[in-house]
């Protein structure tokens, strides 16, 4: 269902940061470090992560255009495909997003017939969500397009370095997860 993506070729916008480092010293990327204080906006980690997030969204929407599903919605569908009958709080923890946002996403997906909600057996106040047959079909069909977006995002990184890149992102999240507005705590982590 994804449209064929036009691949743009462009020259690098940003050059790698290469500051002179005195012999026997390591680069200091701490906030108070000299190198960090001299970094322009486009070289700061937070700015770069935000920009990479924008690029990921653009790639996702380009590859998955025919499905009319957002990355957060696809994350929720994927979560329910491996963990059916989750309540709103569990979904929020799995995705690392706010409960209120989960309720909104569940409502949108329910109106499209991709998920269904039912009352919990143990706690009747709890509503559990699961994929409908149509939700399962869309989630499965979207996988190839989503995977293509991920591959395009990582394309500039040599294959031998991709694991290290992902590992570094995980370390940053693990080390700072407690500082987020919501806590990301997936079952499989």
Where are these regions (language model features)?
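N-terminal leader segment of winged-helix/HTH proteins
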Residues: 1-67, 189
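Charged, amphipathic alpha-helical coiled-coil/dimerization segments
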Residues: 6, 57, 85, 107-174
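Short linear motifs centered on Gly/Pro in flexible linkers and helix caps
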Residues: 24, 97-100, 119
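Alpha-helix initiation/capping motif
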Residues: 34, 38, 42-45, 49, ...
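N-terminal helix-turn-helix DNA-binding core of bacterial DNA-binding proteins
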Residues: 40, 47-50, 54-101, 112, ...
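A short alpha/beta connector and helix-capping loop motif
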Residues: 173-181
């Amino acid at each position: 269902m994804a449209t064929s993506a036009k691949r743009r070729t462009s020259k690098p916008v940003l050059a790698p940061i290469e500051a002179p480092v005195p012999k026997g010293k390591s680069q200091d990327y701490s906030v108070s470090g000299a190198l960090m204080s001299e970094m322009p906006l486009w070289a700061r980690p937070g700015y770069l992560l935000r920009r990479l997030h924008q690029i990921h969204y653009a790639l996702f929407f380009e590859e998955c255009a025919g499905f009319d599903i957002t990355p957060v919605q696809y994350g929720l569908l994927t979560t329910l495909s491996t963990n059916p009958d989750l309540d709103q709080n569990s979904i929020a923890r799995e995705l690392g997003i706010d409960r209120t946002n989960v309720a909104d996403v569940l409502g949108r997906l329910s109106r499209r017939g991709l998920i269904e909600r039912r009352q919990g057996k143990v706690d009747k106040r709890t509503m559990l969500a699961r994929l409908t047959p149509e939700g399962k079909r869309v989630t499965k069909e979207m996988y190839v397009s989503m995977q293509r977006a991920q591959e395009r995002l990582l394309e500039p990184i040599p294959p031998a370095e991709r694991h290290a890149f992902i590992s570094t992102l995980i370390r940053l999240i693990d080390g700072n997860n407690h500082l987020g507005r919501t806590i990301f705590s997936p079952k499989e982590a």
